[in-house]
Amino acid sequence: MAIFNRDADNLIDFIRPDVTSKYEATNIAKVNTKGFELNTDYRFKLNEFNQTLSFGYNYLNDDILDQNKDLSRYSLNTLKHQFITRFESKLFKNVRQNIIYKHAERTIGTSYNVWDASVIVAVNKFNFTVTANNIFNADYIESGYVPMPPSSLLFGLRYNL
């Protein structure tokens, strides 16, 4: 568990007055951020293989003392709540999987839910990976005002020396 309090004066951010203008670095505001973070893991065995179920929660409360009416790229578009859960499992001697669920809510009230998953198969010195990101094709913004990509499928190969 972590508890924190951050005071920032003359916070530098990239802002713009409207969506057609370019971002400019500017000292924009005095911001006080308070919050806490909780993380826990539950470990167990299934068919003699280790499994892990992880939970994490973050809460942020930004007290924007000098209101910024322009579009801020980072600081004023912060998260208020973030919940992440991960299930890491080993199905067979050489097969592992990860399933991740993330829920986030911004200070302005918008929220999103994202599911990711991956499977790793180890064969001798090789690891073959298949990763699915944003499985249900959620529309969301991670940071700033840049939309995140839709669903994607990635394939990987790693050789271990």
Language model features with spans:
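Hydrophobic, well-ordered secondary-structure elements that form the walls
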Residues: 1, 38, 87, 99, ...
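Outer-membrane beta-barrel translocator domains and adjoining extracellular loop/strand segments
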Residues: 3, 11-20, 64-72, 100-101, ...
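Gram-negative outer-membrane beta-barrel transporters
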Residues: 4-8, 27-104
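Generic detector of contiguous secondary-structure segments
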Residues: 17-24, 42
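Transmembrane beta-barrel architecture of outer membranes
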Residues: 23, 33, 78-84, 112-116, ...
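Conserved short-loop catalytic and cofactor-binding motifs
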Residues: 25-26, 145
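Asparagine-centered polar/low-complexity signal
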Residues: 26-27, 134
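C-terminal beta-signal and adjacent terminal beta-strands/loops
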Residues: 116-161
